[in-house]
Amino acid sequence: MTAQRRPTPHSSIWNSSMRKTLLRAACMAALTFMLSGCGIIDYFYLPPPEDTAQELYESGNDAMREKDYVAAAQAYTRLKDNYPFSPYTIEAELSLADAYFLDEEYPAAAEAYKEFETLHPRHQAIPYVLYQVGMARLKSFISVDRPVNNVQEAYQYFQRLRESYPGTEYAAKAEEHMKECRRLLAERELFIADVYWRTGKYGAAWQRYSFVRDNFKDVPHAVEYATEKANVAYLRHREAQSENIREAREGSWKQWFKWL
């Protein structure tokens, strides 16, 4: 009969130590998995950290240098909306208007420049802002057969700039654009007068031509054309009136004879 081998004290101690080591390793593995799991959860379910005001400002400036004006406008808008009191915000507001202007989004540019003036009426860039509003409105002009409210507003802003900031470089530029606005407004009036002329409405045409002759003396070619057309339109208008009177008289006699 074979005797059973009894465990020695050394083997018992070793087994106990081994169990503790394995348990410790298992705990570390579980902790590592949990931490990595939290990282995965954060990655997929938590929103990414927002860009700082400085990062958004620099991103917008980089996009402007690359002439990616849409991306620039987006960056400046995020900065303006998320960090309204940042030291970068004022410059971002003006740069946003510039981005719209350079992207030829002239109505949006005009509104952005106007908003800047409203928020910062004493800012040193106001002469530039007034000039840019005028330019944005002027560039919105399409043709003389469309409403010219944008041209009228452009003229008003250029005039404000010239009167309020006469010594600035932008006031000198505004002077030339005011002449352009006056020319376009005169041509608009002549276009309407010509429509009346072509449709035989000589009285209305004469009034429009006369208006240009009397109110646009700073546009010589328009005054010359309007004066010539006004004279002829007036004569034709009087002729038409005389013809109407004659027809009315003849018509009354015809009616009288029919009654007899």
UniProtKB/Swiss-Prot annotation:
Q: Spell out the GO cellular component terms annotated for this protein, sorted alphabetically and separated by semicolons.
A: cell outer membrane
Q: What Pfam family does this protein match (any one)?
A: YfiO
Q: Which UniProt keywords apply?
A: Cell outer membrane, Membrane, Signal
The subcellular localization recorded is:
Cell outer membrane
Family matches, as PROSITE patterns: TPR
The protein's matches in InterPro entries, at most eight in alphabetical order, are given as: BamD (IPR017689), BamD-like (IPR039565), TPR-like_helical_dom_sf (IPR011990), TPR_rpt (IPR019734)
The record, for Gene3D superfamilies, names: Tetratricopeptide repeat domain
**Annotated signal sequence range:** 1-37
Protein family according to the UniProt entry: Belongs to the BamD family.
Quaternary assembly: Part of the Bam complex.
What does the protein in this record do? Part of the outer membrane protein assembly complex, which is involved in assembly and insertion of beta-barrel proteins into the outer membrane.
Protein's UniProt name: Outer membrane protein assembly factor BamD
**Lineage, opening ranks:** Bacteria, Pseudomonadati, Thermodesulfobacteriota, Desulfovibrionia, Desulfovibrionales
